[in-house]
């Protein structure tokens, strides 16, 4: 039985290694809580008058369901029907899947710099920081002969030009 299992495991690994990866897409979000990604609508927030215009009925009608799985599908349908089905999601703290940065700051530029360079730099301590002094993984890949000119980035925040050294 062990031999059959080992052969099956080897063939599975061989098949996985033979698949050619065409693209790598990294999607990050800023300010999105993991609780909503994995649990859907948070009733405490929906009931809080600071977050609605006096009537939360519409919010509950649109996004509430009996289970976390149903609620998250209602709140983030593309994430759960496409991204989770065809890619990978990380950061469900309920199951100990912590995706933390190593830097001591809890704001954007230092975190994105760490994601893109692979290490924390405590001198990057402001969202107004100058262009990133470090080579990002995207820059490194673009310097490789086979990938030159095939690396792209999109960011909806002006600081990404500095973080990714596009200025």
Q: Each predicted region: which residue ranges?
A:
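Residue-level signal for the start and early helices of compact helical domains
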Residues: 12, 20-28, 106-107, 142
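A broad, structure-centric signal for solvent-exposed, well-ordered loop/edge residues
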Residues: 7-11, 44, 122
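Alpha-helix boundary/interfacial micro-motifs
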Residues: 14, 47-48, 52, 104, ...
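Bacterial Sec-dependent N-terminal signal peptides
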Residues: 1-21
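Short, internal active-site loops enriched in acidic
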Residues: 4, 31, 157-160
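Generic secondary-structure boundary signal with a strong preference for alpha-helix termini
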Residues: 14, 42-43, 130
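Active-site-proximal alpha/beta segments of enzymes that process anionic O-linked groups
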Residues: 63-167
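Active-site-proximal N-terminal segment of extracellular/periplasmic enzymes that hydrolyze or transfer
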Residues: 19-87
